[in-house]
UniProtKB/Swiss-Prot annotation:
This is Transcription factor TCP1. It comes from Arabidopsis thaliana (Mouse-ear cress). Pfam families: TCP (PF03634). The lineage of its organism: Eukaryota, Viridiplantae, Streptophyta, Embryophyta, Tracheophyta. GO terms for molecular function: DNA binding; DNA-binding transcription factor activity. Transmembrane segments: none annotated.
Amino acid sequence: MSSSTNDYNDGNNNGVYPLSLYLSSLSGHQDIIHNPYNHQLKASPGHMVSAVPESLIDYMAFKSNNVVNQQGFEFPEVSKEIKKVVKKDRHSKIQTAQGIRDRRVRLSIGIARQFFDLQDMLGFDKASKTLDWLLKKSRKAIKEVVQAKNLNNDDEDFGNIGGDVEQEEEKEEDDNGDKSFVYGLSPGYGEEEVVCEATKAGIRKKKSELRNISSKGLGAKARGKAKERTKEMMAYDNPETASDITQSEIMDPFKRSIVFNEGEDMTHLFYKEPIEEFDNQESILTNMTLPTKMGQSYNQNNGILMLVDQSSSSNYNTFLPQNLDYSYDQNPFHDQTLYVVTDKNFPKGKVWIQDSFVN
């Protein structure tokens, strides 16, 4: 009895064990049922030794496995993986022409000081109100930027010129950027504002001049090309109409350059008959268009081309350029003077044509 008690005490010294572990190892189960008030339990030493683990760590593992197996509980395994916390961008975005952008704007130190000084002067409590005020005051400049952008898209040549002007404007702004001032704190605020306005006015004037020059040049080129195309189409489709236009272009300067020695008004009689003869007589056109068939009517020394018509009753002497042609592009009477002199000493029915160049 004493030995069992000592063994029990030795077991208590090793640790406190639950009662269910000893019930299975006891030899006298019936004694416990018949004598419930007998607290001194008898257990076989062999079973006790086999039931008690050797160390506390082994006992803990043994206890946990037995309890789970006996009661049927399953504890979920705790995962050692730590989920990464994703930061949410709570700032609202807006849709622009260049895509989605944040509503927040980061300002440099100098611009921020000027901005808040202006906001304090205006008495606004929100930055959006200050920006709204600035946009309203700069509507004219914004319209100029929009117009310049449209012109750049329409005309590439003007776009290059406008780009140079804008670069010069940016350089001037950068040069003035070092001399920037805080609104309300600079003593020369009014003077600097006047200088900036004068510079902007000069730049606007320069832009308008370049715009006018480019538009005029393009218009002149377009008109010239249209005239050339019209003449080519008329010459190809209706050769007779083109020859009539050429003759009218040649004879009009001839009419305007008549000089009379007499005071009488003989304009109608003076050029009417030569024009009719010029249109009707094939010999005159042959001599004028084919210099190789002129024969005796051409004088190489004096550059005289003589056209003879015995049926003509007019008495006059006519001098025309030698290189008379039917070119559309060149004016045969350019830098040349035409003279028509009436002289009764010349025989009737003779027309004298001579070159006369003015140096």
